[in-house]
Amino acid sequence: LHPATFYPVVQGHEYSGVVMAVGSEVTVCKPGDHITARPQLVCGKCNPCKRGQYNVCEHLRVQAFQADGAAQDFFVVDDDRVAKLPEGMSLDYGAMIEPSAVGAHASNRTDVKGKNVVVSGAGTIGNLIAQFCIARGAKNVLITDVSDLRLAKARECGIKHTLNITKKTLKEAAQELFGEEGYQVGFEVAGVEVSIRSLMETIEKGSDIVVVAVFAKDP
């Protein structure tokens, strides 16, 4: 159980749905519209919120962690968190907007073009980060995990280089793939100490490590 999650709680923070009813002053959507919404709940009153830095709200809550999520028949969403889906986009694709936004933002935190990249953690977010790095022109992208299933899914998504770290070390795999050039960008998406330590020990000096995961325990 993740210590940042308040139980009992309804799961579901990556979602889309159909609007059933709206308040009298709502103009961003109407009944029947297909929408998605940001899962972050902010106070709007603290200093970070007043500066527009809602991601570091002093009272930040996230659906499915500190507030109930979308895995229920009906739930209420504030209109300032809503985004209408483009015409013809399926609800399945709509539910991928939030994790895709995380992947796009993370991959844009440092310049990956022409560089060798390691993504530690092949879950949904890690998979998407690797795809965005490829799209942004990374030279080579290696994604690692302990799950062969996740790594197989990564290959299905076009990520050629995968590593199960229970079968070979990152140091060995990086040497084989990148040679003396090594790698210059690492993304920590697993949220465990051994993952970030492995990146720190194997990445080229003077390079960038982007920490994306929320750690259950301090590394």
Q: PLM features: what roles do these ranges have?
A:
Residues T110-K113, R136, A152-P219:
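Glycine-rich cofactor phosphate-binding loops and adjacent beta1-alpha1 units
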Residues G17-V19, G32, C46, G103, ...:
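Buried hydrophobic positions in well-ordered alpha/beta secondary-structure cores of metabolic enzymes
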Residues A4, L41-S120:
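NAD(P)H dinucleotide-binding glycine-rich loop of Rossmann-like/cofactor-binding domains
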Residues M89-K168, E172:
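Mid-domain Rossmann-like dinucleotide-binding core that forms the NAD(H)/NADP(H) cofactor-binding site
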Residues I35, V117-V119, G186:
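Conserved hydrophobic beta-strands of the Rossmann-like cofactor-binding core
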Residues H2-N47, R81, P86-G88:
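Glycine-rich beta-strand-centered segment in the early N-terminal region that forms part
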Residues M20, V141-L142, V210:
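Conserved beta-strand positions in the Rossmann-like core of class I SAM-dependent methyltransferases
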